Structure formats: structure tokens, C-alpha cells
Amino acid sequence: MSLRLKKAEGPMTEPIPAHLSPFIVEQPYGSYTAIDHAVWRYVMRQNVAFHRDHAHAIYLEGLKGSGIGIEEIPRIETMNEALSRFGWRAVAVDGFIPPAAFMEFQARGILPIACDMRSVEHVAYTPAPDIIHESAGHAPILCDPSFTAFVKTICELGAQALSTPEDDALYEAIRLLSIVKETPGSTPEEVYAAEERLKECQAAIGSVSEANMVSRLYWWTVEYGLIGDLDNPRIYGAGLLSSVGESQRVFTDAVAKVPFDLDTCIMTSYDITSYQPQLFVCESFEQLTDAVHVLADRLDIPLGRLKNATESVPIPPRVSSRSAQDTPEKAYPAELIAAYQALRDLRAGGVSSTEREARLASLYEELGRYPEDWLIRLEWLELATQHQVMPEAQAEVREALSRLSTTPDRRELIANGLALIGTAPAASVS
């Protein structure tokens, strides 16, 4: 479905307030490995194939309009230029930033994008903010002006809402859990301890604060919202748009679809470590904007304060036991990265059919060095299938993938990857 995206009036030239600047970092694009790009490509092929029929109608046009493609991790500077046509900018940030800062960025029409990339082990979902979620999840629907109006309004409210020490402790617990889960070498005991700490912080929440109300409304809409018909809704929430596995659950009886209601939303807590048991279906984005104004009146918080880029709301200091530079490093062997890069180079073309088959044969011999790596086998198999070479080796790789389907989650990942090999629908976002 082709939509005509509406461009914003005038360029985005307002300066970023000084108190938000420390959260902005340079995207370390050269640090992304061929494995990182392969993870991006796997997830995006799945996303586009599924959301073609299940996401908000602007999704595919929104991907293109926001400067996002399938084959490689996007450059945030490219996204920034693309989004400026729709009244937005994009900046790179270092993982979790304080909730008030996260909200104020968006209230000012600035999409903060974490630069981290999820690992192969967490390809289906990661609790840590990463570039898949924050670019391919958040950016596409921002090309809809009515959604933009809603996001800026709720985030302006969130930037001014009062938080409690319990809210701040919960933020730190969520951040710690995401770091532990994405850090190679974390022990089950460390993960368990972080999960227990999160549960303790959740249990310590007494009365629902202003910030918690807005956070819940944001979660059930911007992150996990559905729109349209209750029996056949469309997805617009970033958490769903960046996770096909959870999106597929939406259309089963495992997830209750509930008509959107402001009071129900702000009184319904959420758990970032589990699938959502229910989701809210709004009639339109205008309905959501109206709800934000109702909540703002109820909390006696004026809207419109952040339109002047020189005004600001104080941001609480970031308190953490880890430094901003102490981010997880994925310990991929150099030879494995080189093998992924060789496959990436072949996909780019520029070699003869004879040379391509010779390289695929050489890479096939290397697969045995990585007996547990299912993604590189899918990458190899896709190329061999596309160019109709080495049929016996293809059969052996398929058998190896079958043997690697040792858990329900792994089985689903491999099956989803195999389903797209030799098919065209996910090849582009057009």
C-alpha cells in the first residue's frame, strides 16, 4: 500500500538544549561487525514480511521515509536528515537515559536512538534499548502527523511529571537487568539477582506517581499499542514493531485485546521481562492525544512549555553503579566475523558466478568451525539457494539447522529464517 507522507512545515533548526547535550554520543558505526549487520538483516526481513499485513498502514512507507533499509544498520545521521522532513530529528544516545530526558527529547521532536546492537543470542528480543527497537520500532509511525502530535504531547507531559525515589530505583533496576542480560559471560546467578532486584523495586511502588501514570500510558500506546478494529487490529507500538515473535502472539488468544481507556491504562502495570498478557486498541491517534490532555488537566500540568527550545525541565542526575562507557561487548571471534563479512561481500555482488561459487564452497567448509551458529548457516543457505549452486551442501546445511533446533525459541528462529529463503516479499520495503 502506497501512502503519501505529509512533510512538516519548515526545517528543524532549533538548537538542542544544553542540558540534553551530554546524553548525545557519536554513533560508532565503524564498530558494527558483519555479525551485527546480519542480526539487523535477519530481524528486519522478519519484520517487513510480517508487518506488511499486520502493522499500521504507514509502516512500510515510514521505514523508507525515515531512512531505514533492510540490508544494514542505518546511519543515524541519515535518519536525522530523513526525519527532518516530518518535523523530527534523530540523535544517538548511550543506552538507557533518565526517563525525564528520554521524554523531553521526544517532546521537542528529537528521537533518541541507542547505538547498541543486540547479540545473536538475543536476536528475538532484548530488554536493553538497541538500534533495532529505537530506529525500526519508533521511527516509521512518526511519519504520521497525528501520531507525531500524540507522541510529542505525551512526552511533554512525561517530561514534567513528578517522580518518586521508588520510580528512580525502578529505572535503575531495569537498566541493570538489561546490562546483565546483554553482557557476555553473565552467570545465571547474576541474571537471577538482577531480576529479583527488579521485582523488589516493582513491589515497592506504592501509590502511582505522576511519572508512573505517564510511563504506563506511554508503554501501552507508544511501545505496545494497537489501533483499529478490536477483532483485527493493526500494530503501531515500537516494542511490537521490533519483535516479530511478540507481534505474532498479538493475533492469538494468548493476548487479550482491550478497548483503549485512559484510566485502565494508567492503573495497569507492566513487566519488561515477560510477554504482555493484554494490549489496548485505540480507535485513532487523535483519541490518544485527547486522553493525554485529560490526564494533563487531572494532574494540573500545563502543556506547551517545551515549544521554545531554550526552555527546559530539570533532569534528575543519573545515578548508576556502572559508567556510561561500561557497555556490553560482544565477544565474537575474529575469524567468525570474517566469515560473516565474506558472505556480506558476496551479497553485495561484483563477482563472477564462478568466483561466487568458489567462495561459497570455501565458506561451506568453514561452517564446521562454528557448530552452534545457526545464523551464519541461514546466511550461507540463502545465497546458495538464490544462485542455485551446491544442492548437496544446501541439503546438509538444512540438516544441520534441523539439529540446531534444540529449543522452542531456537526452532522458531530457524523456521522463520528458512521460510524467507527464496522468497521475494521481504527483499525490500517498497
Predicted regions located by residue number:
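Mixed-charge, Lys/Arg-rich low-complexity intrinsically disordered regions
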Residues: 294-322
